[in-house]
Regions:
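Non-catalytic, mostly N-terminal accessory regions of nucleic-acid modification and defense proteins
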Residues: 1-93, 152-160, 165
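Conserved S-adenosyl-L-methionine
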Residues: 72-176
Length: 177
């Protein structure tokens, strides 16, 4: 729990986002140990863009979580091949990118990868989004922070139809599924 507070102190974007309930007695210590082992045993060798090892690990965990959740997973996870296709069709090299139901932030992550892979400048786009689910909104905040992607996801989770966090936004690209 102290580690989470320390991370939030160093990264203001994550303030009040990270869970701080790992010290509770009912937490399955064996399961927590398995998660720690999973991260401990990851090969930290260079595979192309080595700075994204943690991001790729997070994406892998999201996909496995989505697999376990079955049909409900569509609420926060879109398969990367679908997201990649959307981004390649739109080619968001510069401007404002908006995802009104951003889930875990996959559209923004893929947009950043697309720009980097094509020699573009990630600082030429601005990412905007929101999500109604509080847990999913926090997952997006963490996903983007891990990857160093700046985005305005609103000050809190909110439903786009009933509480638009970006009512004045004039987006150049809108990505949603």
């Amino acid at each position: 729990d102290d580690a989470m507070r320390g991370i939030e102190k160093e990264n203001k974007r994550l303030k009040d986002i990270l869970p701080k309930n790992f010290a509770r007695p009912e937490l399955d210590k064996r399961r927590l140990g398995e998660v720690v082992d999973l991260f401990t045993n990851i090969q930290m060798i260079e595979h192309g863009n080595s700075k994204d090892i943690l991001g790729r690990t997070y994406e892998y965990c999201l996909s496995k979580f989505a697999e376990q959740e079955g049909k409900l997973a569509g609420e926060f996870y879109t398969p990367s091949c679908v997201v990649r296709t959307l981004v390649e069709v739109l080619q968001p090299f510069n401007g404002r990118v908006y995802d009104p139901c951003c889930g875990s932030g996959g559209m923004f992550v893929q947009s950043a990868k697309f720009i980097e892979n094509h020699g573009g400048n990630i600082n030429k786009i601005s990412a905007f989004g929101q999500d109604s689910n509080p847990t999913t909104w926090k997952m997006a905040q963490m996903n983007l922070a891990i990857r160093g992607i700046e985005a305005d996801l609103g000050k809190f989770n909110a439903d786009t139809f009933f509480n638009d966090c970006h009512p004045q936004l004039k987006a150049d690209f809108i990505m949603a599924n």
